[in-house]
Structures are given as C-alpha cells and as structure tokens.
Amino acid sequence: MLKVDHASVFFAARYGRTVHALDRVSFDIPERGFVVALGASGCGKSTLLNAIAGFLPLSDGRITLDGRAVEQPGADRGVVFQKDSLLPWKSVIDNVALGLKFAGVKRRERQARALELLRLVGLDEFAGAFPYELSGGMRQRVGIARALATNPDILLMDEPFGALDSLTREQMQELLVSIWDKTAKKVFFITHSIEEALFLGTQVLVMSPRPGRVVARFDLDFVRRFAETGDARSIKASPQFAELREEIRAILHSTEDLRSAA
C-alpha cells in the first residue's frame, strides 16, 4: 500500500518569498487502487507526484510504499510524464528495455521482457521502429511499457494524455484500464479533466488551488465497470456519471472563487 500522510511542501522562491505548494495531503492507495488527483493548473498535483516518485523531498509529513519510507527514486515506482522522454537514437524495444539494462539484466532476458510489454500495449510490430516514426499516442504507449519494465509496485502518471487529441485520449484511457486490470498495479494519476478522472479512478481526490489540499474525495466504480463490460459510452452517458461530473465541477469552481476573493 502507498500511504501519504500529511504531506506538505514549501519552495523557496525569488526575493526571499516562500511558496506553499502542498498542505497536509493524506490518502492511501491499496492494492489494485487507481487514485486520481484532479485540480486546476498550479494546485500542486505534479508536486505531489514528484514527492511520491522521490524526486522532491517533503517539507513535512511522510510517504511510505509497502511500509518503506519514500525518500529517493526507486525501481518500485514507474513514472510516465505528459511529454515522453524516449531516447530518439534507440529503437522502441531498446527504449522499453532501458531500465532493465541499468538493472544489469542480460540482453536476451530484457529483450524478451520488453517485447512482452510491447504486446501488452499493442506495439510489438513496432519493436524495431524509432520514436520519430510513431504518433503521439504510440509514443505514450511505449512510455507506459517502459515504466512497467522493472515491474514497479505503482505507476505514477503525470497527465500522460494531456497533449493528445480527444479520440486518441479516449483510446489511451481504455488501454490504460486494460493494462491496470491485467497487471493489478496500483496507479496514481493526475489530470485536470473531470471526465478523465471519473472514468479512470477508483478514488478521485479533488484538490484546491495553491496551497494544494484535498477538498473532496469520491470513491467510484466506473473503471471497474468498464474493465468488466468494455462499454465506455454507456458509462459516460449514465445519469450517475453526469451528476458526479457536475458536482465536481461545482466544487472546483467554488475553490477558484474562494481564491479570487482572498
């Protein structure tokens, strides 16, 4: 289980100012949990993800993964960013296998593992291609495969579909659910899209503008329904989905109004 306990982050800014980015954020991600942090730009979502990844120290609070304190990056956390970080001079399969190479896995074994993951994301036919030959959605699929290569306990995903067109974005959401269902990984996903959060999350954390706080939590089962039925259209068209979308929109607007009035 991932446990985030009263996590706070302060940054030193110019002219001696201090920026309060996160304020006492707490939540858990159990086995097979898919937690989505939802909020406007600048609310601390990426700061929170970077702290979980071990890229950024907390100013206060604690993060643990399966009882171990998170204090630096580790192979137990796979990260996927909005802008892929594929190496352009390496083939798709070598990009996926990169973490395994650093871990000292022999070439034959890491190539076999990478090919297995490319099959999982539907890109095994492109194993020998190079990143420039792929579309944006395909590159993100390679990024997901690479993040899974070291068999992490949790996937951390920082708006990975934000730069994609709407149709590709929906396809990637559905692929991600399939991967989550097959691998049984924990996922922490951040987005500013209400519909994306509702569709993907077993729990949605609605965050306030800076300093980022969790102002509402929603436990959901839309993602499990989709994993069972494959019918995204009826799920998104359901009255329950629409009601929750409007409820969350109202919460986000109210937090923005409070910031404007401050």
UniProtKB/Swiss-Prot annotation:
It comes from the Bacteria. Keywords: ATP-binding, Cell inner membrane, Cell membrane, Membrane, Nucleotide-binding, Plasmid, Translocase, Transport. It is a peripheral membrane protein. Pfam families: ABC_tran. Residues 4-234 form the ABC transporter domain. GO terms for molecular function: ABC-type taurine transporter transporter activity; ATP binding; ATP hydrolysis activity. It catalyses: taurine(out) + ATP + H2O = taurine(in) + ADP + phosphate + H(+). It is found in: Cell inner membrane. Disulfide bonds: none annotated. Its EC number is 7.6.2.7. PROSITE patterns: ABC_TRANSPORTER_1, ABC_TRANSPORTER_2, TAUB. ATP binds at G39, A40, S41, G42, C43, G44, K45, S46. GO terms for cellular component: plasma membrane. InterPro entries: AAA+_ATPase (IPR003593), ABC_transporter-like_ATP-bd (IPR003439), ABC_transporter-like_CS (IPR017871), ABC_transporter_ATP-bind (IPR050166), P-loop_NTPase (IPR027417). Part of the ABC transporter complex TauABC involved in taurine import. Responsible for energy coupling to the transport system. Belongs to the ABC transporter superfamily. Taurine importer (TC 3.A.1.17.1) family. The complex is composed of two ATP-binding proteins (TauB), two transmembrane proteins (TauC) and a solute-binding protein (TauA). This is Taurine import ATP-binding protein TauB. It comes from Rhizobium johnstonii (strain DSM 114642 / LMG 32736 / 3841) (Rhizobium leguminosarum bv. viciae). The lineage of its organism: Bacteria, Pseudomonadati, Pseudomonadota, Alphaproteobacteria, Hyphomicrobiales.
